[in-house]
From Swiss-Prot:
This is Cuticle collagen dpy-2. Collagen polypeptide chains are complexed within the cuticle by disulfide bonds and other types of covalent cross-links. Nematode cuticles are composed largely of collagen-like proteins. The cuticle functions both as an exoskeleton and as a barrier to protect the worm from its environment. Mutations in dpy-2 affects the body shape. GO terms for cellular component: collagen trimer. Residues 189-198 have a biased composition (Gly residues). One of its GO terms (molecular function) is structural constituent of collagen and cuticulin-based cuticle. Residues 273-288 have a biased composition (Pro residues). It comes from Caenorhabditis elegans. The gene is dpy-2. SMART domains: Col_cuticle_N. The keyword Oxidoreductase does not apply. The keyword RNA-binding does not apply. Residues 127-158, 174-360 are annotated as: Disordered. Transmembrane segments: none annotated. PANTHER family: COLLAGEN (PTHR24637), CUTICLE COLLAGEN DPY-2 (PTHR24637:SF421).
Length: 360
């Protein structure tokens, strides 16, 4: 804290200002580091989080599609099992109608599908499936119960002319199923063997010209050449050359005429008060003051007569001289004490004292 009248600085205030400035600097540095760190974390975290969420959504979508495909396959299998159960109920007797004409018989290599309970009409031949694995021979099953008599599409079948169809041949293999769900990406493989070094590339194009270098120093002056020939024709003077450099300063000139007086300056500020001066000479004596009031009357004194001596006590307790020492002709009662060293002693006594002296 600096005073306006002096350059005094409080050391405690200066130390407090320095400590506060250092604390502000530390706070600014910490806030800057935290801001930069948060920005770096944001830049690195947001892309990785987006990639992670994208992978999870893609895998979830694939799993959902796989579940949907599995559900469709199960539904297809259930339908095929149901058709197999329905197809197993229509069992015909073996070798029925052998040697008789049966209009529903087809070639041996063409499978037929029979459905209940009317006469079966073979459908179109399906596409050939892939070759399956050879199966083990199964055990012969028991004979089935005889089926119900069939009917013609337009009228009832005559019992005498109803011929049992031959047993159903095994159906061909069905078409290939829907491709499965793609699997998850495998682990990264090992590093392969390093390839052969490549051949040298084509030479590159020449580079662009570089920047102009700095101006070099001036060269040395060459030798003076030979004098040229004097022209035969009239010499035409050339244009004047450039002005030369200014010459050096000349000697100082003589003193000039004194100039006119300048304007009066503004009055200066009031100076500080000077030291006190010497004391002045004494003044003239003043006039006499007014007469004071009359004082109160004094107390009566005492008189002790002893061997022709008079002892009197005045107001100040002084003892007067004997009667013999009174100057002759002092009939008015005035006396002077012996040993008049006291300049302030009174020159007269009161009337009561004079009466006592006269009586004595």
């Amino acid at each position: 804290m600096k005073s306006q009248t002096s350059g005094y600085v409080d050391p405690q205030t200066e130390e407090y200002d320095e400590s506060r400035e250092k604390s502000y600097q530390v706070l600014i540095a910490v806030s800057g580091v935290l801001s930069i760190t948060s920005l770096l974390i944001l830049v690195l975290f947001v892309p990785s989080m987006y990639n992670y969420v994208d992978n999870i959504s893609r895998f979830s979508r694939r799993d959902f599609e796989f579940c949907q495909a599995s559900a469709n396959d199960l539904e297809t299998e259930m339908m095929s099992v149901r058709e197999g159960l329905l197809r197993g109920r229509n069992v015909t007797k073996r070798a029925a109608g052998y040697g008789h004409y049966n209009p529903s018989m087809l070639a041996a290599d063409s499978p037929q599908f029979q459905e209940c309970p009317a006469c079966c009409i073979p459908g179109e031949r399906g596409p050939s499936g892939d070759s399956g694995l050879p199966a083990l021979p199964g055990a012969p099953g028991p004979d089935g119960a005889p089926g119900r008599p069939g009917t013609t599409p337009n009228a009832s079948c005559i019992p005498e002319r109803v011929f049992e169809p031959p047993p159903c041949l095994p159906c061909p293999q069905g078409p290939r199923g829907v491709p499965g769900h793609p699997g998850f990406p495998g682990d990264p493989g090992e590093y392969g063997i390093g390839g052969r070094p490549g051949s040298d590339g084509m030479p590159g194009k020449p580079g662009d010209p570089g920047l102009a270098g700095p101006i070099g120093p001036p060269g040395e002056s060459g030798p003076i050449g030979d004098k040229g020939r004097t022209p035969e024709a009239h010499v035409i003077p050339g244009p004047p050359g450039d002005s030369g450099l200014p010459g050096p300063w000349g000697p100082p000139g003589s003193a000039g005429m004194p100039g006119e007086d300048g304007y009066a300056g503004t009055p200066g500020e009031k100076g500080w008060p000077g030291p006190p001066g010497a004391p002045g000479p004494g003044g003239m004596p003043g006039p006499n003051g007014p007469t004071g009031e009359q004082g109160p009357s004094g107390t009566p004194g005492t008189c002790v007569c002893q061997d022709t001596e008079v002892v009197m006590n005045d107001e100040k307790g002084r003892v007067p001289a004997p009667r013999d020492n009174v100057a002759p002709g002092a009939t008015g009662g005035s006396y002077e004490p012996q040993g008049g060293n006291d300049a302030a002693a009174p020159s007269a006594i009161s009337q009561s004292q004079n009466r006592r002296i006269r009586k004595w």
